[in-house]
Amino acid sequence: MAGCKPTTGLNILLITEYARSVQAFAVESVENIMRLDWKQVHAAETAVSGRYITSIACLDEKTDTNELAMVLDVEQILYDITPANHDLHATNLQTTKFHIKPGAVAIVAEDSKVARSMLEKGLQAMEIPAQLHITGKDAWEKIGVLAAQAQAEGVPITDKIALVLTDLEMPEMDGFTLTRKIKTDPLLKDIPVVIHSSLSGNANEDHIRKVKADGYVAKFELNELSSVIEEVLDRSMKKIDGPLISRKQLA
């Protein structure tokens, strides 16, 4: 197996499903399986030099031990292995006109550096102005600032925020929590929210429906993302309520 030099003689493969594909990671051993709250995970771009680390997880709350684990940027790994399969093909974008008010921006929450870069290029190709954030918490704080500005000016929040585009798994605040906070706030609930995640499958889509997101696209396909954003913004402009918009509904 390329790049692997096992020292234990054990051939253990950790099978994952990510970004519409199945992968096998060679590991020497499995020490423990833990469930963590995303509040225990912190962004690490400025603290860790490795390009394959996206965040650091605190495995316990004991200050004397304070065990830490580095979280892999799987999207970066997949992009390096098969870049053609995990790129946003902006050159092949089907051009369209998006219903965005002048001055409004897209708020993007994405912890993976490579995914964030691809989203930035994709939104530029769509001519959608965007502000990018590493965590859901950062995005939520920016939404609060823009909401305060909208209130002070006496204008709808959609004059400031055209849509929110968020990943699901992020440090400090995940995409489910971010979406739920937006959709349960009377002042923010009209902001269209599109989930753009490497996690796929019916279970995740059910969770996305429960938090009342407006759209869902599995990474990475720019035309699908563009189509979902177009439909979500069109429905928002016409003030039409409807079911979750995903590539299944648009197919």
Describe the function of each predicted region.
Residues 135-138, 174-177:
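Acidic catalytic/metal-coordinating carboxylates
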Residues 176-189:
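Short amphipathic alpha-helix used as the core "switch/output" element in two-component signaling
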Residues 177, 199-219, 223:
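Alpha4 helix (beta4-alpha4-beta5 surface) of REC/receiver domains from two-component response regulators
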Residues 147-165:
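Active-site beta3 strand of CheY-like receiver
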Residues 103-114, 119-123, 164:
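Conserved acidic segment of CheY-like receiver
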Residues 170:
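Receiver (REC) domain active-site loop signature in two-component systems and cognate sites
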Residues 29-63:
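Flexible, small-/acidic-enriched active-site or ligand-binding loops
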